[in-house]
Structures are given as C-alpha cells and as structure tokens.
C-alpha cells in the first residue's frame, strides 16, 4: 500500500503569489543586494542579471543543527542562463553549500513575473532531485524558508 500523497516529502518547491507592484520591481528585488538582505535575510549576495552571470546568495550559519542537513545557512549559487528584465530568471547548475556538510545539487531556480491588473503574479520554482532522505529533507526545510522569504518580499515591495 502506498503512502497518502500528503505524507510524501516534496521533491521540489513551487509557489505563486500576487504582489501589488510592477513586475520589473519584483524581478529587481532578486538582484538588488540591499533588497535581498531584507527579504531573504542574506548576509551577502552577488547576482548578475545577464546570461552566464553569477547568482550567489549567502546566509549566516545557524547555531542549531538539522539531523540530516547539519547547520543551515551557507551559500546557494548557480549560473544565470536566461534573464528577461522584469519577466524571467532561470538559474541552472545551482548548488547549496551548507556550512559543514556536503553540497546539494545540481538544481535549477526559475522566477517569473507576469503583469496581472496593476499587480505582479510571481512564480518561484526550485527543482532538481536525487532520491535520498537528505534531498527530501532539504526540500521540506527550504519550502518553509521560501514561504517565509516570499511573504517578506511581498511585504517589502508593497510598503
């Protein structure tokens, strides 16, 4: 007998939300170091909005340890493969480098912005998966992180 779908750990993250501001401003928040520090709580970022640009974000290591992932924080980095100003970002060959453990990757990060009335429909998807407990735990943890960060992004941009 297979487990109910709700009990299956996620193998990617995807969320869509409506933000009351122009798409160009939403997309810009994924590249502006000051904005990234506010909504994503990053301590440092290097993000280049062009094909083959670097996309790297660093967080302070946590003091507590996850049983499977170790300390959280560390660096997420990849290569910008596609960038359409105000509309789309695609980062490939992305990896999470935790403070103390082995990297997790490769992954992809997709961000799209669509005008909807006077607002922006933001879609964020992070994918890439290896069938292991560590990967499943990673997606369970980042889902909470993304949800909190995207809520902060919305609040930051709607002020």
Residue ranges and their predicted role:
Residues 155-159:
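Short, highly charged C-terminal tails/helix-capping segments
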Residues 14, 34-75:
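Short beta-edge strand/loop motif at the mouth of beta-sheet-based domains
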């Amino acid at each position: 007998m297979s487990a109910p779908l709700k009990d299956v750990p996620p193998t990617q993250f995807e969320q869509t939300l409506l933000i009351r501001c122009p798409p160009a401003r939403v997309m810009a928040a994924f590249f502006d170091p000051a904005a990234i520090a506010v909504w994503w709580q990053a301590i440092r970022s290097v993000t280049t909005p062009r094909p083959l640009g670097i996309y790297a974000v660093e967080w302070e290591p946590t003091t507590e340890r996850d049983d499977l992932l170790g300390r959280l924080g560390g660096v997420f980095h990849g290569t910008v493969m596609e960038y359409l100003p105000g509309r789309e970002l695609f980062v490939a060959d992305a990896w999470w480098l935790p403070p103390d453990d082995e990297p997790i990757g490769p992954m992809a990060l997709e961000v799209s912005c669509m005008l909807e009335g006077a607002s922006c429909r933001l879609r964020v998807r992070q994918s890439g998966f290896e069938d292991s407990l560590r990967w499943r735990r990673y997606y369970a943890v980042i889902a909470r992180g993304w949800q909190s960060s995207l809520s902060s992004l919305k609040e930051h941009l709607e002020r």
